[in-house]
Amino acid sequence: SALSAHIVRQTPKEARLHMKTSESYLPEGSYMVQPAVRQAFSTLGALRQAQDEGRILEAVAQRCTAAHDLLFDLGIAQGILPRVSCALGVAEGDTREIAILSRVGKPTCFVVTDIDESTDPPTAWLSRTIVQQKVQDRLLDSLRPGDVIPARVTHLEPFGAFVDAGCGVPSLIGIENLSVSRICHPSDRLTVGQSILAAVRTVEPENRRISLTHRELLGTWAQNAALFSVGETVRGVVRSIEPYGVFIELTPNLSGLAEPRADLRPGMAVSVYIKSILPQRMKVKLTVIDVLAPYDAPTPPRYFITDGHIEEWTYTPAGCDKKTVQTIFRQE
């Protein structure tokens, strides 16, 4: 079966639905569409009720003042998110000011801490750090290595992709964990603002840090090879050039080898003819047909696992004579 190469524990559907609405926290941008959030901005009474309940709300930050307070138009009130309440680590000097400035024009989570009706319009005082502290505490307490969660890409660095693991709480996916196929930069695989899935790699309560991985959700060698047939001509991307041949990515977790060609460079899109697929050697042999126009953006990932929990994942096909590529998600 498709799951034979890895052990996956799926959460029962009813529990999953309950978890997603009440127990888990979603990346920023996920809350604005929720009816309860929209309803909170309908009247001052509804906003006060949301304040009393400590409900997570969300709106787009309209501007950042010279003092680095964020301002929001909540319809029935003006929202002010003071600088020290904009993100975890700001008050302590551990978080750079760009983390505040870059919220302008983006959905931002918060709770209401006070409402001043003496102003016109009324002023709602907000806090994002209260939300993030609560979310970070819950994530550190409840997540285990191998848990599959939603995330949103916030920015890309040469060493990896930073993602929002819930209400703006940051996490890192190292470049080596984005896919099995090697890439030059995370932008070869992901785009800023993209919604993705990820698996928890490590949970470090003492450092208040969670690291994630992505490649285990993108399928084993056999699962990816099953998408192709010998004799087909398909599109691929040149990933690396070696003296003995050119590695061409067919999917993020499947590459093949073609004969050397002087006109090829990493990142080029090409069409390739599939000469052979050899599970025993974990090899796909290709012939380059043509160089194609470059891709505008990375292809959205195809996930073979979309929820639940992974105990272990084995990329290498059964009976293959190559070194086994495997991830075992250990509880620290």
Language-model features: where?
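Beta-strand/loop nucleic-acid-binding surfaces
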Residues: 78-98, 171-186, 254-264
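Residue-level signal for secondary-structure boundary sites
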Residues: 134, 171, 220, 256, ...
